[in-house]
């Protein structure tokens, strides 16, 4: 299921957001998408869009990441992902983001066995080896963070 968050902005504000550098937020959790979108809005940071891919039965975070890379005003790609269905596409998108001068920042909650079990029950995702995943995405140029606040802080610093 695809979920968009109501960012409580007018048509004028949406046009203003598109006219300046902004943040795209992609999440596999609808609740996290809403929390982060609200946090970024509270910091007066413009969002190009915030989308939740849910259990990814029809579309994946990689699909929206590839779309976000094509948006000229999107300068920061912030992700909350429990797993990646297409890791090679993710890594290719990360390299493309670097080429375009866009920062990709990732919060991945699968560090502990409890987090991996939670991901499996939440979205049906199978989280792989955390250390291997982290090494690969960092080598591809992705900024990795450990906490939700860091995700918002890094996105804000990169945008300003």
Tell where the protein language model's regions lie, with residue ranges:
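Catalytic-core regions of core metabolic enzymes
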Residues: 1-160
